[in-house]
A protein has these predicted regions:
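Juxtamembrane/membrane-water interface recognition
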Residues: 20-21, 96
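Short hydrophobic alpha-helical segments enriched in small aliphatic residues
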Residues: 11, 18-20
Length: 259
């Protein structure tokens, strides 16, 4: 049995190491090492092998966290995190958030859900379940661990807004039964659950309404405007602009989002 492991076993909560030092079981050096290990933040990122999740995993590792990356690979890819697999502080797990998960973490970032219409309309029932059941399972985990948790929501909670730009106080204009509803309403329901857990269980939550993010590792065929423009430009094709070209859209680079 290694000294570091012995240190973890014998360290009293208030730092009174007494007999353990006197009999030579542990040393001040192993105590310091064990305390440093204990203070290292352990973070769960669901959807961590996706476009956004993989960049978040990189940033958390750079900040000195232990990272558990969770993904079912529906739209995520192991290739997105292949360069992280040799990092001893990174763990990759294949798991679907619609099923309960039992891990020990300090913080949770819930990014699991297909975000492109092509992907989320492929199986709309599964999309809704991912948003709703996934939120319930991750909130339940956060409640049990008293962990901080962040929900990756979306500007799509505003639906087809009649207010531009949209303040956070705007409730939106959403079609509850349309083809996009599996995503829009699923994310709205997830936000409801997050705020109810805060009110009812005093859980530490954050909700981020993400919008039109682009950058390395975005799926080239996700049907969104930036990827469409890039693919058409690389092929030497005219860029497709729908309607009269009067639309406005805000974009966010992935590094800025993670920051």
């Amino acid at each position: 049995m290694g000294l570091a492991f012995l240190a973890v076993i014998y360290i009293p909560p208030k730092g009174d190491y007494g007999d353990a030092f006197r009999v030579g079981i542990i040393t001040p050096q192993t105590v310091f090492k064990a305390q440093a290990m204990h203070l290292k933040k352990r973070v769960l990122v669901t959807g961590g092998a996706g476009f956004l999740g993989s960049h978040l995993c990189e940033r958390l590792l750079a900040q000195g966290c232990d990272v558990i990356c969770l993904d079912n690979y529906f739209t995520g890819s192991k290739q997105n995190v292949m360069h992280l697999l040799d990092n001893p502080h990174f763990e990759l797990m294949r798991h679907d958030v619609t099923f309960p998960l039992y891990v020990e973490v300090d913080e949770i970032y819930n990014l699991a859900c297909p975000a492109s219409p092509i992907h989320y309309q492929h199986d709309p029932v599964a999309t809704t379940k991912t948003s709703v059941h996934g939120a319930i399972n991750m909130l339940g985990l956060a409640k049990r661990l008293r962990a901080k948790i962040m929900q990756a929501s979306t500007s799509e909670v505003y639906g087809d807004p009649s207010v531009h730009p949209q303040p956070e106080s705007y409730w939106g204009n959403v079609n509850p039964i349309g083809f996009r509803s599996c995503y829009d309403e699923g994310k709205r329901c997830a936000e409801t659950l997050f705020f109810d857990y805060r009110r009812q269980h005093n859980l530490r939550i954050k909700v981020a309404r993400i919008f039109n993010t682009y950058g390395p590792r975005m799926h080239p065929n996700d049907g969104r405007v930036v990827s469409n423009f890039i693919i058409q430009a690389l092929r030497g094709e005219p860029l497709t602009v729908y309607g009269q070209g009067q639309q406005t859209r805000s974009f966010c680079y992935v590094d800025d989002l993670v920051e």
